[in-house]
Structure formats: structure tokens, C-alpha cells
């Protein structure tokens, strides 16, 4: 197999980084590996409507994850996820920068190849548009999906743009990728259309309700469908995550978001991503740390199924 470099874009997909997520060994042959979960960095931010810079999110998340690597039995879990799951980091997706169509093709192909070889995908963005080609690959493999979506925005806007990080969840139901009536959006605190039957749990409501009540509503909505889990870091209040392109005050605390995530252990989560970390706007790497922690907690959700 031939590997790409940033200087010489080829048809093959991955470029190395200096280190992997959680100090995991880098593996540039993910399709042939025995991994359960494959982490891919997705340095794409050409679909943003506000501040750019999320293309540097994967690097920042990996760097922050080094601070999490030492804790073998992560609190409050009772196990080391690295002993339950075979997790690899395959580096960053390579595509022709400036060419969104090429990005979409490469993202779908990479995820589809991983899924067809028995792996699951955890993707580190990048802006939130990366979720659309990932949903296409997952729906092709698993069928129609339920979506669990943490965000300040519903991303259901119909503005006619083919590449926009605010339109994916308008497009995905139209393409039959997700069932909006079995999907839930958590942390919303911006104006949005109510034409689609998503269950919307606004940030004020989530902050007022108990964690247990929020988890109950999520589980009640998605049922036993295969679930795609996506976490836009701007779901968190800017006091916890300032380093993002479109921050909105009044969001969730990192504590509440993590507790909600930990309640989702018995759902059939088949794909996951963390998006919209833009380190140039960060303070003391707290947004990158939040992104790394959320990504790690997502993996612990999967490890908990091995009990």
C-alpha cells in the first residue's frame, strides 16, 4: 500500500502524526488490523459559517489526550478500556485541501472500508459537516440510523448549500440516512425549524432536569435502533469550551455532559465523532481537553459492553 503525504496527495488515504490518541500506537494499515475501534483525524473545516480553525482539532485533541493516558482505570469506570477494546489511531484522512467533493468521497470510502472489514469508527473533527459522509457510510452498512446529537445548534438549516456545517441534519433525513422521529438533539439553544420530528432537548431544559431524566428521554426516543453519536463541542458552555467556531452562552457543563454520556451504555452505538474543536480560540487547552475527554468517554461506553 502506498501512503500519502501532505506534499504529495495520492489516492490513498492516511498521513502520519507524531503520536496517536491516548498515546496509542499509530497504525497505518487499519483495514487489515484486528482493531475493534479505529480513530481517524479529519482535518476539514471548509464548511464553517463562522470562525475557521477546526481543521486543527484532531491534532489538539490528540495532544490533550496525553494528559488522560496515565489513568489506567479511569474514574468512575472500574476498568481500563485499552484492556477491553483493541483501539488504534490510523492518523489523519488525506484529501485535496480546498476540494470538498474530494473530501466527501475520501471520507465515505475510508469509513465504508473500515465498516466492511469489521471495525467501528471514532472520528475527530474538523467541522461538523464531516458527520454527513460518515452517516452515509454507516447507513449503507447498518441501515437507517437513530442520531444522538449534542450541540448548541440543530444543524437542520435549509440554505441550499451543498457544503455547510449547519445543514447535515436537514440533508440526512432527506437521504434516508437517519430517522428524525427516533433521533434526539441535546443542548440546543439557538433558533431552529420545527418541521422535522427530532426530539429537541434544549440546554435550559437539560440543565433543569436531572441527568437521569435526560438519559431516560434519550433512550425512550432511540429505542433499539443502531445509533450514530455525534458531539459538537459547542454543546458545552463557552466557559468550558471557548475554543470553537460558533460558541453560544448558556450551554451544558462538562460534568453534566459526561454524566449524560455515561448513561448511554446499553444503546447500540455503531459510530461516533467529536467535532468543532478550534484550538486557535482556546484558553489553556481546556476545549481540546474537553474534546479528548468526551472521545475517551465514548470509548468507555463501548468497553462497558464487555462486562
UniProtKB/Swiss-Prot annotation:
The keyword Metal-binding applies. Mn(2+) binds at residues 128, 151, 153, 155, 232, 234. One of its GO terms (biological process) is spermidine biosynthetic process. Its cofactor is Mn(2+). It is an enzyme of class 3 (hydrolase). Its EC number is 3.5.3.11. It catalyses: agmatine + H2O = urea + putrescine. HAMAP family: SpeB. Catalyzes the formation of putrescine from agmatine. Belongs to the arginase family. Agmatinase subfamily. This is Agmatinase.
